[in-house]
């Protein structure tokens, strides 16, 4: 009887069918750039000051500048304060008394804020995300990142339950509806709620696209195909720069960025299901039809005899999260990878969310960030082949951290230098993230691989949630976030020196393979009973084609 991997080898690892699928899976990744990073351009800094009703309603014949002078104090730089106003004088006060600043006690704004009249409506302006509400800008990003975590937890099982195709269709539809609804909210609280739901859907289709590619593309091209699909996020960031530059009204920007999602209805007719998943559900005939279709598209038709021999592959049971900490070697690997994934997310998103803080034009910086991320992802594949996984991971993380540390000592009047350092950091962080996916999968043995990937991915999402909150520490000292974003990747990178190299090695199946440091034997299709006992569990071999991929 032929196993699925043998049949797919006859179909071809990366023929025309898989190329088309990779392109299709790249579209949601392309659109994800807007959903994740679009808000950065909706809350740009702009001048504002307290709206002082008593001056506006007074009968004094004063110019706008004079009204501002008697109602708003100046800061140390001589500019009007953004969050303070003079306490309103008594009704009996004369204009002379007011102009002489006899009533110069200050208070917080109590009637809202005034913004430049010639500026398009921004999210910050409409919902007054300033002064005591300014932290909501960063908090909303944490809410979105929390939605990504919840979405991974929810849609992972859904993807395994109803299939990759219907799950992806549902996630794309949910993304389009919630993102479009966000453009019409009347309160910031509703905006946050919809952004959370949008993030859960985003996490779902980012997961489903990777799973579909991994289950259709053969092993010789799988890494390149996944990287190619993920690189569309970088392309989306570049397009976002131009879109945000041309559309400054936040509601119109939201609608414009969402509209392409609604055009993906054609996925209903062209998106294939995963034959691996169909086999796992006992739907063998449907799987055979799909595999034969792919073979015909690739110009490599299969014989009916070979298809009729198609059976699910036998694998052993997977462990749970606690099993990762029972074995000394697995415990060390797991703890280091938790740190690596946490820092990967922390550094990558910190640079992306601070795109406007490096001194140069935010739109130009965003364009450059997207442009360097794409080669960063592809060059990481070359680095892994030349330097090995361990040293590639160590070097990219350390380089990203060093860039942050250097930025601390660069004067603010050298924005070009700061931006160049940030761009190098962005390149390194994108490469580090890509390497982590490959390296982590190779470090965990088969019996515990998916559980390990799921656990470290949780900490990656936690890193994303914490990132905007760390950025809030700049209100105490501007260097605090930079020190954190710089020191943690250096530390995590150095920890990678304690990990084994996996370049050129066959994936390990069992704990015995791991302990002996030998490639897994080709005759093994399932873990031995003693391996499961070493994990503190025993179980008989069962049939399982597709393991859960929650993250």
Curated annotation (Swiss-Prot):
GO terms for biological process: negative regulation of fatty acid metabolic process; nicotinate transport. Residues 44-142, 189-195, 246-251, 354, 426-427, 474-478 are extracellular. Glycosylated. Glycans are attached at residues 57, 61, 74, 104. One of its GO terms (molecular function) is nicotinate transmembrane transporter activity. Belongs to the major facilitator (TC 2.A.1) superfamily. Organic cation transporter (TC 2.A.1.19) family. This is Solute carrier family 22 member 13.
């Amino acid at each position: 009887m032929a196993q699925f991997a043998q049949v797919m080898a006859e179909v071809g690892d990366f023929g025309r069918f898989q190329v088309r699928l990779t392109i299709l899976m790249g579209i949601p990744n392309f659109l994800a750039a807007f959903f994740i990073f679009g808000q950065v351009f909706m809350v740009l800094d702009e001048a504002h000051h307290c709206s002082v009703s008593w001056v506006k309603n007074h009968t004094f014949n004063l110019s706008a500048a004079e009204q501002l002078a008697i109602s708003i104090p100046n800061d140390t730089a001589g500019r009007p304060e953004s969050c303070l106003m003079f306490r309103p004088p008594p009704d009996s006060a004369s204009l002379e008394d007011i102009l002489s600043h006899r009533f110069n006690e200050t208070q917080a704004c109590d009637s809202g804020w005034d913004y430049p009249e010639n500026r398009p409506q921004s999210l910050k302006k409409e919902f007054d995300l300033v002064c005591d509400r300014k932290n909501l800008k960063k908090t909303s990003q944490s809410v979105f990142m929390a939605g990504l975590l919840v979405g991974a937890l929810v849609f992972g099982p859904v993807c395994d339950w109803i299939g990759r195709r219907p799950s992806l269709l549902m996630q794309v539809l949910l993304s389009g509806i919630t993102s479009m609804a966000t453009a019409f909210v009347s309160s910031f609280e509703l905006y946050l709620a919809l952004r959370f739901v949008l993030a859960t859907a985003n996490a779902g289709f980012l997961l489903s696209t990777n799973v579909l590619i991994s289950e259709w593309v053969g092993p010789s091209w799988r890494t390149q195909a996944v990287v190619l699909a993920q690189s569309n996020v970088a392309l989306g960031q570049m397009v976002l720069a131009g879109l945000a530059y041309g559309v400054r009204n936040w509601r119109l920007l939201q609608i414009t960025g969402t509209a392409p999602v609604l055009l993906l209805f054609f996925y209903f007719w062209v998106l294939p299901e995963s034959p691996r998943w169909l086999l796992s559900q006992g739907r063998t005939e449907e799987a055979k039809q799909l595999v034969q279709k792919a073979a015909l598209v690739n110009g490599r038709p299969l014989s009916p005899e070979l298809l009729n021999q198609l059976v699910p592959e036998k694998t052993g049971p997977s462990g749970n999260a606690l099993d990762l900490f029972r074995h000394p070697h697995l415990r060390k690997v797991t703890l280091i990878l938790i740190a690596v994934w946490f820092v990967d997310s922390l550094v990558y998103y910190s640079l992306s969310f601070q795109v406007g803080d490096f001194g140069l034009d935010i739109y130009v910086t965003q364009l450059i960030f997207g442009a360097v991320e794409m080669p960063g992802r592809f060059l990481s594949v070359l680095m892994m082949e030349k330097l090995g996984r361990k040293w590639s991971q160590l070097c990219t993380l350390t380089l990203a951290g060093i860039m942050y540390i250097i930025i601390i000592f660069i004067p603010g009047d050298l924005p070009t230098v700061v931006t160049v350092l940030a761009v190098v950091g962005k390149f390194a962080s994108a490469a580090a993230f890509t390497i982590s996916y490959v390296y982590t999968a190779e470090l965990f043995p088969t019996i515990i691989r998916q559980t390990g990937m799921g656990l470290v991915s949780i900490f990656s999402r936690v890193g994303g949630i914490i990132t905007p909150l760390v950025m809030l520490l700049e209100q105490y000292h501007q260097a605090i976030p930079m020190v954190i974003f710089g020191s943690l990747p250096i530390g995590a990178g150095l920890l990678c020196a304690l990990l084994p190299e996996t370049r050129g090695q066959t994936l390990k199946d069992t704990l015995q393979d791991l302990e002996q440091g030998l490639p897994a034997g080709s005759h093994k299709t399932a873990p031995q009973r003693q391996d499961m006992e070493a994990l503190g569990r025993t179980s008989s071999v069962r049939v399982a084609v597709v393991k859960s991929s929650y993250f």
